[in-house]
Amino acid sequence: MNDYSYEKGIAFIVEGATERVFYEEYLKKLCSERGMTITKDEKSQENKYTICAENRSILVLINNVGSVSQMTNSATWFHRACVKEYSNIGWSVFLCYDTDAYNSDITKFHEGDWLRLRQSIESDAESIADLAAQADIEDVMLCDFQGVLAFLGLDNNTPMPKGRKGKVKIKQLFRRSDPACAYHEGERARALIQTLDIDLIEKHSSSTTIRHQKSRGF
């Protein structure tokens, strides 16, 4: 058990390493805007963060499952790393995943294995919410297309590459910037993500890219 005095816990269950980095940077931005601090526990084997504001402390744990197909198996992690380890606080859970298509119906992520995942964690969660990105997380990043171009040193008149997925488009932009320079996912994408205009991404994604479905009154 852990006796640190937290007010509440927030669990992010994310699809891949790039999603983890993106939401880490997004949390940093939100904390900065609200006069809060966010600190990563470098000694923990988990992706563990503490958000502090005045006398309040909020625990954040992020589970990177590797692929959307593995996300439905994450209930074990939630019960072990969150509920059992910090049983004295309430938990809000965010399921962060790609729908893989711009017109994909989010309701399919409430059926089958996904329904069983929600049922297995809902008794120990104060709320469960979906952060569903249409196609790749890179599509979200491309909402700040000018920011991506600036990071790569490309002219601001550079056209958006063709391709169905954002990951394909970003890879093309990296090659256009430098044929020897490749786009890397995960931690190596942090430098790019840190330069992006999160406010702009948030503005665009609220209507076109990220769909946030709430449940249980969250």
Residues covered by each model-derived region:
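Short glycine-/polar-rich loops that comprise or flank the Walker A/P-loop
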Residues: 7-8, 90-91, 124-128
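Activity-critical C-terminal alpha-helical subdomain
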Residues: 97-182
